[in-house]
Amino acid sequence: MASTLISSLAVVLPLTLLAPSMSMKISRIDVLGYICNNGTVSNEEAYRRSYQINLDAIRGDMRHVKFGTHEHGDPPERMYVLSQCVSDLSSDECSLCWSRATDLLSQCFPATGGWFHLDGCFVRADNYSFYQEPVSHQDTKICASDKEKSAEFKGLVKEVTKSIVEAAPYSRGFSVAKMGIRDLTVYGLGVCWRTLNDELCKLCLADGALSVTSCLPSKEGFALNAGCYLRYSNYTFYNERGLLAMSFTKENLTYIFVISMVGVLAIAAGFWCGKCFYMRTSPKKKIKGTKTKKFHLFGHLRIEKESESICTESHLMSFEYSTLKKATNNFNESCKLGVGGYGEVFKGTLSDGREIAIKRLHVSGKKPRDEIHNEIDVISRCQHKNLVRLLGCCFTNMNSFIVYEFLANTSLDHILFNPEKKKELDWKKRRTIILGTAEGLEYLHETCKIIHRDIKASNILLDLKYKPKISDFGLAKFYPEGGKDIPASSLSPSSIAGTLGYMAPEYISKGRLSNKIDAYSFGVLVLEITSGFRNNKFRSDNSLETLVTQVWKCFASNKMEEMIDKDMGEDTDKQEMKRVMQIGLLCTQESPQLRPTMSKVIQMVSSTDIVLPTPTKPPFLHDSM
């Protein structure tokens, strides 16, 4: 049965048809990526009928305006469909691309829907109104296998994508760019679905720009987002003839519009000249106390426009304060998710229904200023499925705001250390959290060369499926190539920061900073997840006891099972849990050289074939034990 071909797929499958020829030029009707939803409908026949009715309703629009939306059916199985062609395609090319995409999407059913990204068009169907979604956790990127490692090429790609991000939202959601230097030329194209407003379009393309620039030094990069598509290449892939036709049509319309408005403008000009003459001959009143609009930002006097560059330079959306105020009902206490060292985190709902998390920071002095700059700088450079997505920022004279994606299950500590909620976390979910956090840290250490410095349960956010995302990069530091330690002499005592109970001993006592301090914090987190106890609030007869030392004692006396969280039930794989606890102990060894890298941790958690070494004593354990 055709419907079983690709049903029940919950992950993006990029370039299924294209992957073998990624080094070759691709066709505009080649499939770049697709997804079929996990959920299924109860009445497949009726759902397919709704799909066909929706397609029939937008067929004419696709040929004439290359875009269409329609919905049909009764909730909860009402179907919503959106499809759009890239503007440079001709009507015939659009029809061909759309026909192929819709045929392929029909194979998803009885899933509740899915989407197909072709190079020249996009189609999506689902059982809810998704039209205002700019980004999604299912967004993906594709990077070509061919490389161009010159610095000039990288610079051109960044300039081309930046140009598209800035131009497309104000050009009906579509823009192309071309830049060259000597024998190198980069071509780019960006398109937003027409249901997005300018702000959401820019947000989507900015996110796409981050994705494709992380492909470098690949010669081609593709960003497949929920609300847009962005591509760069080293050859002309778009239809220049189609662009000329678009330009000709626009010029004709502009000419007609200008001619028709000349009379109106002439009359308006007459009124304006009269007003200017009156103002020049009238007595002038001096208004006292007027000044250029400036404000204090991070303890420094800056012009408002300059503050916005902090966002725009990182390809981030600059949110209006009024938008965030409305989204949180004037930062109502009922919207507050938590409180941190420099402010609070609120849940917000934008006018299109999209939920966001807003970190409001009360800034005064250099330290919080540096942390805000640092957080924006770090997270805007890094993109991974296990790192929280930064959407944008906002600055006022009193506060600064960082806007993130909202994750429904908030932070791990809210669930893990709650006697009732922790029962939601079976071993499968906890293992997923441990592995996902390790993968996020591996990406930070190996790809971004970043040390997080504050890994703990409250900085691990969970989505609806309990998949983890590392957050709060205010203390993160870049470290040298090769993973060498940052010299302690370069760190002032005040710059040694983190959370007691999670900080590695060599960092506390000597200021030695390497990626092994994250390994230590991760090890503490692993022991918390497997035991259900909080490390710095662990209770025992010995007031100096910590969770880490207690687990090590149980390991040494072959009583590890006593430390396993009983709330996971009797069906838990005790052997696997004890193995993961041992990995936690390996990460919390006193000697940083003995702690495994995150790559090794992932291997040890994923494969039981790897024999684990015996962990040495953790720090702060008295020899009298």
Curated annotation (Swiss-Prot):
Source organism, top-level taxon: Eukaryota
GO cellular component: membrane
Active-site residues per Swiss-Prot or TrEMBL entry: 454 (proton acceptor)
Reaction(s) catalysed (UniProt annotation): L-seryl-[protein] + ATP = O-phospho-L-seryl-[protein] + ADP + H(+); L-threonyl-[protein] + ATP = O-phospho-L-threonyl-[protein] + ADP + H(+)
Modified residues (Phosphotyrosine): 404, 507
Chain segments annotated as transmembrane: 253-273
Residues annotated with Phosphoserine modification: 458
Keywords: ATP-binding, Glycoprotein, Kinase, Membrane, Nucleotide-binding, Phosphoprotein, Receptor, Repeat, Serine/threonine-protein kinase, Signal, Transferase, Transmembrane, Transmembrane helix
Entry annotated with the keyword Cytoplasm: no
Glycosylation sites: 38, 127, 234, 252
Cytoplasmic-side positions: 274-625
EC number: 2.7.11.1
Name of the protein: Cysteine-rich receptor-like protein kinase 46
Organism: Arabidopsis thaliana
Gene: CRK46
